[in-house]
Amino acid sequence: VGIFPPDIGGPATFVPKITNYFQDELNYEIEILTLSDSKNLNIKDDFSIKRINRDLPIIYRWLKTIFTIYRMGKNKDLIFVNGLGTETTIANIFLKKKVIRKIVGDPVWERAYNKGKTSESFDDFQVNNHGVAMSLQKKVRNFSIKNSDVIITPSQHLKNFILDLGFKNKIEAINNGVTIPKESAKIFSNNYLNITIVSRLVSHKNIEKIIEAISDLNNPLIKLNIIGEGPELNQLQSISLKSDFKNKIIFHGKLEKKDINTIFSKTDLYIQASNYEGLPHSLLEAMSYGIPVLCTPVGECREVLGNEDRGYFLNLPVSKDDIKSKIDEIINEKNIANKKSEEGKKFVSEKYNLTNTFILYKNLFTKLLEEEDK
């Protein structure tokens, strides 16, 4: 239950991969329920999927989603939740099935930040008071999380977040995994610097600051690839059009995985400037290609990059001046950036290999199914 392509983002990318593994390797029978834009309701899928129109009136959509989860869940052994957590919790009051939920962030904080209702960090937001409406949203979130049987997080930071909410059941921190490409990107193969961002276009990703920083550098040898969609697209395009750098900023929109891989193979630097991430999937993918990465020390990113021996950190709060400074540093010390990228690829290949991730999921789900059979 939850997010699924053609929606974008790390969770949407992960679900088809784990579904394929469960079906092909473990012979699980799987049905998927997701919300989709009206234009995507009838697209052809390789899985058994029920799509509900997210453009429906919210109360009607909410009730329809709860009823559909109940109807689809009656003959299932487990419910794996990657979104629609509150709706699943309500449906499961009647289903009484075992619920495994993957938590990759806090939707309450993300909504508040993207709507300009808070400028606080992820951690500060959890402990501070933000009025009755926000407190109610937090209570609903906590109720849903606490009624899960198992929580999976991609990072220790998110595991601690769940523990701080008072969750008493089983928590597993399972790293996101990526497929390791056979060949690395051909970084710094000429004088040009191809920079890539793969992201939902929302305010807490700070893409506006990246555009401003690169525009200020005014280096004709730099090109910026922005891959993704989101509510800030028009605003970001407007900012880029006003800059002298506009012909060097390319908005690719949502791309197929093979097309993203093609761009990665020609990328010299990957930037992730978010105010918060659990463990960004696209960052791991960039590192798997041996691409130097520049990111904020948030969530699990601090562990992934270590003491900057596998990449470069931006300071918080994110500023365009710091981004400019770090890009200049990388341009002037390409040999050091090369070494960091090699260490990054090695680290990701060993710790974040998708095969290892699948094995951990297999062990967890097998144990849960054995418990159900007792």
Where does each model-flagged region fall?
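Conserved donor-binding/catalytic core segment of Leloir-type glycosyltransferases
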Residues: I152, I187-K205, I210-I214, N225
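Short hydrophobic beta-strand element within catalytic cores of glycosyltransferases
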Residues: P292-C295
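Membrane-proximal helix-turn-helix segments that form the acceptor-binding/catalytic region
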Residues: I66-K74, D123-I151
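Short alpha-helical donor nucleotide-sugar binding micro-motif in glycosyltransferases
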Residues: G73, I145, K254-L255, T262-T267
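Conserved acidic donor-binding segment of nucleotide-sugar-dependent glycosyltransferases
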Residues: N307-K320, E329-K334
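Acceptor-binding helix/loop patch of EC 2.4 sugar-transfer enzymes
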Residues: I100-K139
